[in-house]
Each structure stands twice: as structure tokens, then as C-alpha cells.
Amino acid sequence: MNDLRYPIGQFTYKRPITEEMIDTWIQEIEDLPNELTKAIKDLDQKQLDTPYRVGGWTVRQVVHHVVDSHMNSYIRFKLALTEKNPTIKPYKEEKWAELPDSKLPVDVSLVMLDSLHKRWVNLLYSLEIEDLEKTFNHPETGETKLAVAIGLYAWHGRHHTAHITSLRKRLNW
């Protein structure tokens, strides 16, 4: 049986990371607002409030989570570019998904995601090779190079989009 938590598998990448990989990942980050918008197109309120799996988040919560996560990532990139290996602040994503703003219409987060990604992608395309080696420190997962973080967040967007598209396929929406 497929693991509904990881419809595209867990994040992995080939080493060494190449410029082509970075370019592909940045393009995936750039495409995410459109891909996520397409994934929820024509879903009604009941469908948006359907969990993608038993015990999982609703489609609505997934959309809001993507924005929460990518806002945090954008800030982590800016910190890593302006400080030496900064320790970033983790957050309790499962608790954030329960806050009242996670019940707002998904359009609110889609607009935010589009604007955020325009800024983030602009920043990513401006990076020099040496910038990709810069790091941030996560108190739980350790040091992460920006090159790896680009891949991780490209995967993250595809991962959550696949939660929605695989749910649609399973339920014939």
C-alpha cells in the first residue's frame, strides 16, 4: 500500500548538487503557486475541509501550511545570507495548522504564496555559487546548506501538492 504521507517519497537528492539541479529546483519553487492553484481548482468547501488521509490535515490546512513553511524558509535564507550559520527558530507546524487563520479561504494563502515566491525566486536566482554553500543551523536537524534547502523546499511544494492531487484521484474529484 502507498504511504499517503509521502505520495512522491521522502526528500532525497544526488550528490554532488549541480547547477542544473539548482536551476530545476528553483523552477519548481517558481511554479508552485500555479501548481497548487491548479491542484485545488474547482474544489468546494466540503472538499477543502477533507483530510488528505485519516488523521492528516485538510486540503485547506495543507494550503495554509505551505505558505507558513515557505515564509519560514524565506526568512531562513535571508538569515543565512546575512549572518554566519545562524541558528533558526523551529516552529510547531501541527499547532500552527490549528490556529484560526488556517480556516480562512485558501485564496488568502494562494495570493500570499504567489507574492512570497516572486520575492524568494528573485533572491534564489541572484545567488552566487559561494552563496549556495552558506548554512543555517536548525536546533533539531543541524546544519543545512542553502543548496540543499533549495532542493528540500522544491520537494516540499511538490510533496504537498501531491497530497491534494492524489486525494482528488482517489476520490474521483
Curated annotation (Swiss-Prot):
GO CC term (a single one): cytoplasm
Cofactor note: Binds 1 zinc ion per subunit.
Keyword hit for Cell wall biogenesis/degradation: no
Keywords attached to this entry: Cytoplasm, Hydrolase, Metal-binding, Zinc
GO terms, molecular function: hydrolase activity; zinc ion binding
Function statement: Possible metal-dependent hydrolase.
Family named by the database record: Belongs to the metal hydrolase YfiT family.
Position of the signal peptide: none
Main location: cytoplasm
Pfam families per the UniProt record, alphabetical: DinB_2 (PF12867)
InterPro entries membership: DinB-like (IPR024775), DinB/YfiT-like (IPR034660), Put_metal_dep_hydrolase_YfiT (IPR023774)
Name assigned to this protein: Putative metal-dependent hydrolase BC_2708
Binding of Zn(2+), residues: 65, 156, 160
Subunit structure: Homodimer.
Annotated organism of origin: Bacillus cereus (strain ATCC 14579 / DSM 31 / CCUG 7414 / JCM 2152 / NBRC 15305 / NCIMB 9373 / NCTC 2599 / NRRL B-3711)
Compartments, record wording: Cytoplasm
Cofactors demanded by this protein: Zn(2+)
Enzyme Commission code: 3.-.-.-
Keyword Zinc (UniProt): yes
